[in-house]
């Protein structure tokens, strides 16, 4: 039975459109939101963890670069004039490692289009000059306990929302930041609009959740949804809008007439994306507790979100850094025909054997690491693969080495199998290129060592943070292991009783599961225990699995450590970001009472 539609509360509403989920997202988002969204603010998120390294390399080659150029050349060029005419203000972290360079490019575009804008720049996140002193003082990496590396490419503190709010208070039309937490571009808007104080922690948590929901673009409006076939019109999928109120409640929706799907399930999946312990979601401005968040229908493609709680933040910023750890090369070949998997496996092994001989003869050491994947044979499923003998396989071979020249020598061999070995070998696509292996490192830095600043025109001013408050423990939450009611049961795949969404943080993958009906939550908790998940995904997950509960949305969150082969650019896997982890787990068999399967809607 469908839940009744709950009317949204009345009062001032601030409408914020999430125009970009990453650097490389569609250029249609800002156009769609400005033309049909009726929004007050347009916010952009461009900075994945490793994007900063890419931007740092760009700035080393050309000092005027180092920011997300698409923000200026595509996004703003297509909407800036209309945004100014409609009074839409813009907040973006497109500044990367060169926020002032980005601001200069925006000003140049505004002049070209004949519009007047006040552009503010938030800086202070670059802590690379402090890394050596912190290393000497004994600071270590958060997860591994390793010392901070000697050579880093980038090191940036995740700033919060307060500098953005202060820039808007100063009447900026456009705010450009470097590294900040993704949700800060939304929370900063709400702190400015509603005058939320820096110690109004419940509202700060709610505003952060609103930002978290829209920070990945269409992932909140049906993108990556478990029930993908129910999501209409992918080609014109609607970008997300949050309609926010002073009390912290907000409605998630999308522009009218667009594709996509906004339901408690699609929004709930995004809540679970890339989070750890939902009672301790750490941000620079607030420690969020999302366990009791509730989501209710508020009309077609409208979901009302309430219930976020907050506590005082810590006195530290998280630093995200990247350092080079050798080089890698990855190439693909398509093998067609009889015994394709066996031919592909032998091709990969022969390439490695030949490569090692060539390295020895050229005076190079062996590869640091190698990985062969046979795409099309369910290689990601490990022991759970059930692919029928296939007659078409993509061989994906990745290797790493300490020296670029060694891999340049090896990469010349990737095309040779097309005439040397297996029949049906095709699809080489040219010689693969060698790229740096960038490892992520994270540590904490005292907030007192970092000074965020806002520059507006010729004026630069520091942003003073409120004095730290003692930490508070979250309210206790009754938990249980779940039960399996008496009576006959049936074995079904997990996807039959749950929605799923997975994400990454470094080498950790989280898998969020939402019961398809509240009555199924006890079954979900009973059947999906951490030790069972660790066993089922043991071919991928090398560390412990932790489970957390979010009863407000009838969900659990599984945090799998050492699950991504190093994660990001350090991983040799085809899925280094864990995008498929939830899909793998949703195939796990679970026992469900037959009575529930018969009584609940399909």
Q: In which residue ranges do the predicted regions lie?
A:
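Gly-rich Lys/Arg/Thr-decorated short loops/hinges at beta-loop-alpha junctions or inter-strand turns
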Residues: 9-12, 49-65, 84, 127-151
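Short, Gly/Pro- and small/polar-rich lid/capping loops
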Residues: 274, 278-301, 468-498
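N-terminal amphipathic/basic leader segments beginning at the initiator methionine
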Residues: 4-34
């Amino acid at each position: 039975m469908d839940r009744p539609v709950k009317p949204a509360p009345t009062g001032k509403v601030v409408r914020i459109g999430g125009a970009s989920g990453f650097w490389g997202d569609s250029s249609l988002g800002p156009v769609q939101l400005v033309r049909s969204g009726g929004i007050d603010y347009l916010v952009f998120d461009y900075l994945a963890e490793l994007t900063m390294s890419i931007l740092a390399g760009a700035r080393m080659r050309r000092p005027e670069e180092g920011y997300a150029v698409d923000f200026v050349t595509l996004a703003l060029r297509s909407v800036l004039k209309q945004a100014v005419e409609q009074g839409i203000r813009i907040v973006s972290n497109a500044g990367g490692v060169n926020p002032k360079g980005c601001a200069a490019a925006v000003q140049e575009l505004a002049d070209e289009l004949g519009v007047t804008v006040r552009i503010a720049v938030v800086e202070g996140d670059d802590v690379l000059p402090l890394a050596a002193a912190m290393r000497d003082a004994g600071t270590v990496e958060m997860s591994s306990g390793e010392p901070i590396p000697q050579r880093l490419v980038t090191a940036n503190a995740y700033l919060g929302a307060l500098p953005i709010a202060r820039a808007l208070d100063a009447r900026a039309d456009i705010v450009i930041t470097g590294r900040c937490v993704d949700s800060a571009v939304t929370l900063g808007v709400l702190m400015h609009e509603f005058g939320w104080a820096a110690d109004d922690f419940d509202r700060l948590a709610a505003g952060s959740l609103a930002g978290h929901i829209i920070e990945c673009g269409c992932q909140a409006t049906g993108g990556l949804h478990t029930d993908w076939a129910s999501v209409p019109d992918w080609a014109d999928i609607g970008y997300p809008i949050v309609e926010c109120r002073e009390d912290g409640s907000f409605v998630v929706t999308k522009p009218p007439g667009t594709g996509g799907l906004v339901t408690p399930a699609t929004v709930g999946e995004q809540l679970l994306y890339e989070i750890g312990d939902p009672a301790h979601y750490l941000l620079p401005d607030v420690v969020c507790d999302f366990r009791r968040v509730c989501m209710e229908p508020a009309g077609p493609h409208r979901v009302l979100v309430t219930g976020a709680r907050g506590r005082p933040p810590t006195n530290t910023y998280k630093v995200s850094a990247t350092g080079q750890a050798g080089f890698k090369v990855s190439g693909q070949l398509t093998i067609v025909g009889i015994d394709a998997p066996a031919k592909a496996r032998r091709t990969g092994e022969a390439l490695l054997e030949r490569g090692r001989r060539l390295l020895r003869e050229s005076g190079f050491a062996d590869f640091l690491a190698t990985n062969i994947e046979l795409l099309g044979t369910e290689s990601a499923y490990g022991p759970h693969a059930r692919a029928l003998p296939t007659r078409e396989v993509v061989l994906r071979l990745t290797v790493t080495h300490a020296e670029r020249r060694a891999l340049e020598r090896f990469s010349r061999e990737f095309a040779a199998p097309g005439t040397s070995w297996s029949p049906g070998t095709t699809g080489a696509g040219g010689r693969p290129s060698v790229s740096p292996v960038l490892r992520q490192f994270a540590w904490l830095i005292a907030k007192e060592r970092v000074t965020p600043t806002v520059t507006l025109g010729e004026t630069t001013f520091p942003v003073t943070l409120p004095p730290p408050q003692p930490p508070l423990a979250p309210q206790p939450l009754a938990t249980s292991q779940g039960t399996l009611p008496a009576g006959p049961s049936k074995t079904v795949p997990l996807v039959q009783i749950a929605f799923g969404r997975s994400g990454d943080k470094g080498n950790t993958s989280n898998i969020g599961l939402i019961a398809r009906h509240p009555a199924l939550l006890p079954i979900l908790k009973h059947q999906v225990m951490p030790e069972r998940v660790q066993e089922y995904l043991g071919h991928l997950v090398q560390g412990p699995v932790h489970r957390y509960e979010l009863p407000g949305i009838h969900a659990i969150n599984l945090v799998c450590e050492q699950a991504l082969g190093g994660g990001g650019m350090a991983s040799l896997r085809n899925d280094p970001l864990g995008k498929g982890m939830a899909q793998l787990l949703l195939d796990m068999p679970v026992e469900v009472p037959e009575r529930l399967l018969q009584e609940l809607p399909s």
